[in-house]
Each structure stands twice: as structure tokens, then as C-alpha cells.
Amino acid sequence: MTYNQPNNQGFYGQFGGQFVPETLMTAVKELEVAYEDSKKDPVFQAELKELLKDYVGRENPLYFAKRLTEYAGGAKIYLKREDLNHTGAHKINNALGQVLLAKKMGKNKVIAETGAGQHGVATATAAALFGMECTIYMGEEDVKRQSLNVFRMELLGAKVHSVTDGSRVLKDAVNAALRAWVAQVEDTHYVMGSVLGPHPFPQIVRDYQAVIGQEARAQFLEKENKLPDALVACVGGGSNSMGLFYPFVNDESVEMYGVEAAGLGIDTPHHAATITKGRPGVLHGTLMDVLQDENGQILEAFSISAGLDYPGIGPEHSYFNAVGRAKYVDITDEEALEGFKILSRTEGIIPALESSHAIAYAVKLAKELGSEKTMIVCLSGRGDKDVVQVKERLEAEKEVK
């Protein structure tokens, strides 16, 4: 059966929907109409395609990681090189699409939330390109962890709001951005950074990120003359993974692995393993798996990587998990640091800490699958933003002599 989600109410099975105050309902409905129109608009599609090619640098390579494969001692590992995009991660695919859509809707301001700062940088970049006013909401903790990205956003002309509510991380930045959107919905578009939020956001972000899997599928067929046995990608909100997975959803022979952040371990309170440890609940306008206590209070997510410590997961991922289309696994901070070092030393590629979770799991999976099998790993971003943090962490552990 051909996959056909979401339904016309924006649900993926039981997950998804539009759980927003009346004040935002008009805005999400307006966005729905504008997005559907843009899909049929050849001028819009041509402009987006041209920007992805000439500005972002797509298509990026599908690279056979020979030495990483040898290190793992099993399945052939291919890397989809989203780290080579302009701004250094997959986030630009979605930011460009949404800012172009905002322009088409006649909005002159954009706002966005950011965790690691990559989506903030991508949105500020797209806003600069189109001459739009841009405000980014970022948790105070993340502002400290990612000061370089804060400077980048300001350099690109964006205002960065440090959010001091709650645990001062990504979920609090989303809350602040949604509140701000309610107040200025007439002239402002909210650029959602992941496959989260009320419909149509999860679908819009998925569709703009699907370029990852569309390219990877064609590139893999060209190189191997068959489809891969497995796909591996890290999952916070889940946009790079959904971008890789979605174009393969009807290829039943292809297994999909979403790698969540286990932080200090899933049996401690310090992790972000939403599928493993969460249960369905409503957060940020959508019904999805959420980390919550027995009273339904949202728990704090934790990860070494600022881009993965979100207490929810995109509703389509919750659906994939519920119907068994994808498997969700987890990798600890320690394992991710090991992945960070392994890829750097075997391939000369320094990955983002988010992507390092996928690398660490891919090495384990490659051993299990054996040398006859093949896989694609989404290398969602480069590690420049994380080098100082990793340096401090490893020096504290006396690993670097």
C-alpha cells in the first residue's frame, strides 16, 4: 500500500493534528493554503530548486566511507554529506523553503527557535538573502553552549532573544517563539525548525528536507545498482532523519533506524530518548511521544548535543514507531563522543555531535549486519560548532595529552 500521510486533518494515525489557541488557528490555516498553492506553483518550485543548487550547493555527495567501514568491520557505510551544505548542516534546506514561502505570503518578518543554533543560523541566512527582519529565540543554556552561533546569527542581521523561562533550552525557546508569533501573526512567519508543531509544519519541514533522501536514493542506485539495506540518522525533533527516511518509506526492504540521545543513560533522568521512554502527549501544538512524568508534566531532556535535547519527537516518527516502519535506538553521550573521534580519525571528517550519535550507532549496526549489507548514514552537520565543547570535555577527562 502506498504511504499517504498525513490525512486532511494533519494526523499521522493518532499523532499530529492542530492543538493551538484560536488566535493561531487562522495563521496555520493560511499557511496550509499557501503551502498547497506553492507546491503547484512552477515559479516558486523553480526558484527553490535554483537556490538549493546555486546557494546551498546541492546536490551534495553520497560518500563511501571506506576506512570507517573497515573500522566497523561489517556493512558498507555511505555518508550523505549534509555537512557540506552552505551553513554546515541540513537545516538550510528547510529554512530556505520556508522563508521563500513567507515571502510569497507577503510576510516581511520571520521568527524561529533554535537549540544548537544551526536552525537559527540557517533562518538568519535565508532572511538576509531575502532582506527580511529576523528574530531568533534561544534558551539561555544554549546561548552559553553555542556562543559562536549566536555571534553568527547577529552578524547575519538577526536579533537573538535569550529565553530565561523553564529549563532555558530548546522547548522553552519554542514556547517563546510561539507566544511571539501569536502577537505578530499579521506580518510574521514562524519558521519551524523541525518536523514538529501543529499541522502543516511537520509536513512542510518533511517535504523540504526530503531532498536528502531523494538525492541519496538516486545516488545509491547509481553506485550500487540496488537499494541500501539500512538508513541511519540522529533524531531530536527528527527533521534530518525524516528527510532521509521519507523517500524510502514505500521501499519495504529498507530498514530505518532513528538514533535518539541517551545522554547519561536511559535509566537515569538525564536523556532525550523520547520514543524509548516517552508516551503520547500534546506539546507545541501537536500530539506526539513526549517525555513526561506520571502527572503529564514535561520532563527536561538532556544530551551533550544541544540539537537533540528536545522532550518530544515529530508526530510522523511517533507514527513510524507505532506501525513498526522505523526502529528507534539510543546512543549515550560517551558513545557519541567516541563516534565524533572515530569519524574524524578514519575519514578526516569532523561531524556535529548530533550526527556523531548516528555514526556511533552505524558502527554497531554495521557489525551486526555483516559485510554483504549496505547502509546510508545521514551526516546531518559538521562539527565546527562543537569542537570547543568537545575539547573542554576531553581535557576534563584527561583524554588529550
Curated annotation (Swiss-Prot):
CDD domains: Trp-synth_B
Domain of life: Bacteria
Keyword Lipid metabolism applies: no
GO molecular function: tryptophan synthase activity
Modified residues (N6-(pyridoxal phosphate)lysine): K91
Keywords, alphabetical: Amino-acid biosynthesis, Aromatic amino acid biosynthesis, Lyase, Pyridoxal phosphate, Tryptophan biosynthesis
Cofactor annotation: pyridoxal 5'-phosphate
Catalytic activity: (1S,2R)-1-C-(indol-3-yl)glycerol 3-phosphate + L-serine = D-glyceraldehyde 3-phosphate + L-tryptophan + H2O
Pathway as given in its UniProt record: Amino-acid biosynthesis; L-tryptophan biosynthesis; L-tryptophan from chorismate: step 5/5
Top class in the EC scheme: lyase
Documented EC number(s): 4.2.1.20
One term under GO cellular component: cytoplasm
Oligomer status and interactors: Tetramer of two alpha and two beta chains.
Described function: The beta subunit is responsible for the synthesis of L-tryptophan from indole and L-serine.
Family of this protein: Belongs to the TrpB family.
Name of protein: Tryptophan synthase beta chain
Organism encoding this protein: Lactococcus lactis subsp. cremoris (strain SK11)
Source organism phylogeny: Bacteria, Bacillati, Bacillota, Bacilli, Lactobacillales
